[in-house]
Swiss-Prot record:
Signal peptide: 1-28
Gene3D superfamilies the UniProt entry points to: 2.70.98.10, Immunoglobulins (2.60.40.10)
Protein name per its UniProtKB record: Glucans biosynthesis protein D
Keyword tags: Periplasm, Signal
Organism of this sequence: Xanthomonas campestris pv. campestris (strain ATCC 33913 / DSM 3586 / NCPPB 528 / LMG 568 / P 25)
Length: 533
């Protein structure tokens, strides 16, 4: 499948999540019991793993289907006008804290998802019912659609706030969640396969969800998912705890059908068009456009790393080799409205997503894929864990991790962290430039920097390494407005080529590191574009 086409559609559809399900007048209707199929059957996670294992032993069959013509021909606005009725919400007739509503098939969503309700350890399939939907401006009516159509996915909301969801599962293996800010942003996936290899990427599908009815006093919703694709099948358990930071405790069991070249565990999918450090696509009136601005990593060896994101001119792939990582994630550190000026999509409220392994993951690498994009409708950033050992047919791969969705990750370095990265033409203002160079200004705050910034005797130095080229005008000086420090340097390319240059920087004093490690990858412009003015 072509990644750009798939993700452009998925990003557009997911962008509308969190909209009210129906106008307020429809929310007060009395709950209606949902129609169910068959008889309740015993269910637990071990049984679901058995189902996934059996799938992997059989030849793969596509789960996509040809939809009725009226659904195939829906445009974006028509599809978005189809809303699930509050009076048909799952668990609406109970006393618990949560409810679930369902997404309709149509537009980009052609894979029916079977959804089951689990009560007292027994699962029963929920029947698609056209009467459960308000078809809005779609031009559709219940009589036009088959009664066995199926669903596209589901969303969760609290009983106290029925018109806003806090998590949604829709399209392939994509899902999203929000923290207290209530603003959707980046997505997660159940699995990534062959992302950034240069060849076709495979997008596994969740083909069934099992929603366990929570106890009335529970703050957690448990969801199970059955995943399938040409290369692998899998069973997932999500324990979703809603709060200021939403936490998903995830267990997955994967069963490969064939060897997988690049397996991505805990994949985060985001968007970066333009920002302080990368203005290649800055023709928009808004100063910055991104769901997240950097990849943070806490390595197995205890090092904290910050890698600002870019919108590169060509596909860019980076791997950060590690063993038993403690965590990683795509973060939105810049939370200042003035830096975005968008009062429609509120980029400053977009959630960070932190991946925390529950046990040792062994050897592998955190991998980052950055894809060129011309606008914000394309999710062009992916980060995931790739095990060093390639999965083989017949194996069982068990992976457990937690996802944290919120304004800040649950763990942070005691050292100072990077708060901004800016770049521009190098040289000394007022003096004629004899050669091309590119300036980097990296701001750090936190840790011991506030105290050191006040100490005239403090000797803070920038420790800088580059893979190619030379550096000049290197400095580290107090930045009192931030109660921190600014490191600055110019990078001179070694030749007229455009080969990427890797940069590594941190601040230290008295031989001791003061900051997390800042990593960057810079692509020098072609010789024809190197203006020195």
């Amino acid at each position: 499948m072509q990644r750009r086409h798939f993700l452009k559609n998925a990003a557009a559809a997911l962008a509308a999540l969190g909209l009210p399900a129906l106008p307020p007048w429809a929310l007060a209707a009395k709950a209606v019991g949902l129609r169910r199929l068959g008889q309740p059957q015993p269910f637990d996670y071990a049984w679901l793993k058995g189902q996934a294992r059996a799938l992997a032993k059989a030849p793969y069959k596509s789960h996509k289907q040809v939809l009725p013509g009226p659904l195939e021909s829906l445009n974006w606005d028509q599809y978005q006008s189809i809303r699930y009725r509050q009076d048909h919400a799952l668990w609406a007739d109970g006393n618990g804290k949560f409810q679930a509503k369902f997404f309709h098939l149509g537009l980009y969503f052609h894979t029916p998802v079977h959804i089951y309700d689990i009560v007292d350890g027994k699962a029963q399939q929920l029947a698609y019912d056209p009467a459960a939907f308000d078809y809005g401006r779609s031009g559709l009516g219940g009589k036009q659609l088959p009664k066995d159509l199926g669903f596209a996915g589901f969303r969760l909301n609290t009983r106290k706030d029925t018109d806003r969801d806090f998590s949604a599962f829709l399209g392939a293996s994509y899902f999203r969640a929000v923290g207290k800010e209530g603003q959707y942003g980046q997505s997660a996936r159940g699995l990534a396969i062959d992302t950034g290899t240069g060849g076709p990427e495979e997008f596994p599908d969740f083909i069934a969800y099992y929603l366990e009815q929570p106890a009335d006093d529970s703050d957690t919703v448990v969801v199970y998912g059955l995943l399938d694709s040409p290369s692998v099948s899998g069973a997932y358990r999500f324990a979703i705890t809603n709060g200021e930071v939403l936490v998903m405790d995830i267990d997955s069991a994967l069963y490969p059908r064939k060897a997988i070249e690049r397996l991505g565990i805990g994949p985060c999918t985001s968007m970066y068009q333009t920002g302080e450090n990368d203005r290649r696509m800055d023709w928009d009136w808004r100063p910055e456009i991104h769901d997240t601005d950097g990849l943070a990593m806490w390595t197995g060896g205890g090092e904290w790393i910050w890698r600002p994101l870019c919108n590169p001119p060509h596909l860019r792939f980076n791997m950060f080799v590690d063993e038993n990582p403690r965590g990683f994630g795509l973060l939105q550190r810049d939370r200042n409205f003035d830096h975005y000026q968008d009062d429609g999509v509120f980029y400053e409220k977009r959630p960070c997503l932190w991946v925390e392994p529950k046990s040792g993951w062994g050897k592998g690498s955190v991998q980052l894929v950055e894809i060129p994009t011309v606008d914000e409708t394309f999710d062009n950033i992916v980060a995931f864990w790739n095990p060093q050992a390639k999965p083989q047919p017949g194996q069982e791969l068990l992976m457990g991790y937690r996802l944290y969705w919120g304004a800040h990750p649950p763990a942070s370095s005691p050292l100072a962290h990077c708060v901004a990265t800016r770049t521009g033409l190098g040289g000394i203002v007022g003096q004629k430039r004899s050669h091309f160079s590119w300036r980097f200004a990296v701001d750090f705050a936190g840790g011991e920097l506030a105290a050191l910034a006040k100490d005239p005797k403090a000797k803070v130095e920038a420790v800088l390494q580059v893979s190619r080229g030379t550096t000049e005008i290197v400095s580290a000086r107090p930045l009192h407005e931030l109660k921190g420090y600014r490191a600055m340097f110019d990078l001179v390319p070694p030749d007229e080529g455009t080969q990427q240059i890797d940069i590594r920087l941190f601040l230290r004093a008295n031989g001791k590191p003061l900051t997390e490690t800042w990593l960057y990858q810079w692509t020098p412009p072609p010789a024809s574009e190197r203006k020195i003015y």
